[in-house]
């Protein structure tokens, strides 16, 4: 389970869907996330601890209903766990810093990695590269 609090963003500040996704390994409804159609340049961070996770230039429209990226900012930004729930095998992704649940990674993404990091908007915040504005997912 993800850590309940962090110095930058205590879990008590999370709304219901953000808490469900990040702390209870939940999934937001497809096509419902605030950051799904975001096309601005910047950095996507973990909502719970503000750790950088993905650059906007690795984001693409996979058509799956959740923000999709083909690579994280670094190898240690993401923690990978086997997930055998729902009678299938998947690879869960969590924040490498605070262990918040982010989503799953699949081997059907574009080059150069061939991976699709399928991430819940509710687990992310976005920092605009032009003006520094932050948007919580």
Swiss-Prot record:
NCBIfam families recorded: peptide-methionine (R)-S-oxide reductase MsrB
GO cellular component, one term: cytoplasm
Chemical reaction(s) catalysed: L-methionyl-[protein] + [thioredoxin]-disulfide + H2O = L-methionyl-(R)-S-oxide-[protein] + [thioredoxin]-dithiol
Entry EC no(s): 1.8.4.12
BP-aspect Gene Ontology terms: protein repair; response to oxidative stress
Gene3D superfamilies referenced in this protein's UniProt entry, alphabetically: Peptide methionine sulfoxide reductase
Cofactor note: Binds 1 zinc ion per subunit. The zinc ion is important for the structural integrity of the protein.
Top class in the EC scheme: oxidoreductase
MsrB domain boundaries: 7-129
Protein name stated in the entry: Peptide methionine sulfoxide reductase MsrB
Annotated positions binding Zn(2+): 46, 49, 95, 98
Cofactor(s) this protein cannot do without: Zn(2+)
Species, as recorded: Serratia proteamaculans (strain 568)
Family membership noted in the UniProt record: Belongs to the MsrB Met sulfoxide reductase family.
Pfam families: SelR
GO molecular function terms noted in the UniProt entry: peptide-methionine (R)-S-oxide reductase activity; zinc ion binding
Coiled-coil residue spans: none
Residues the record marks as active site: 118 (nucleophile)
SUPFAM superfamilies (UniProt xref): Mss4-like (SSF51316)
Keywords tagged on the record: Metal-binding, Oxidoreductase, Zinc
């Amino acid at each position: 389970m993800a850590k309940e609090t962090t110095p930058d963003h205590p879990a008590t500040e999370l709304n219901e869907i953000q808490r469900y996704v990040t702390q209870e390994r939940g999934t937001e409804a497809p096509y419902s996330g605030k950051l799904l159609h975001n096309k601005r340049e910047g950095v996507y961070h973990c909502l719970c601890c503000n750790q950088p996770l993905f650059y906007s230039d690795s984001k693409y429209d996979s058509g799956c209903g959740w923000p999709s990226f083909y690579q994280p900012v670094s190898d240690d930004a993401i923690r990978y766990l086997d997930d055998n729930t729902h009678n299938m095998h998947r690879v869960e992704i969590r924040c490498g810093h605070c262990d918040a649940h982010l989503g799953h990674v699949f081997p059907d993404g574009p080059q150069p990695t061939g991976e699709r990091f399928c991430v819940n908007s509710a687990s992310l915040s976005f920092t605009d590269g032009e003006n520094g504005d932050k948007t919580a997912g």
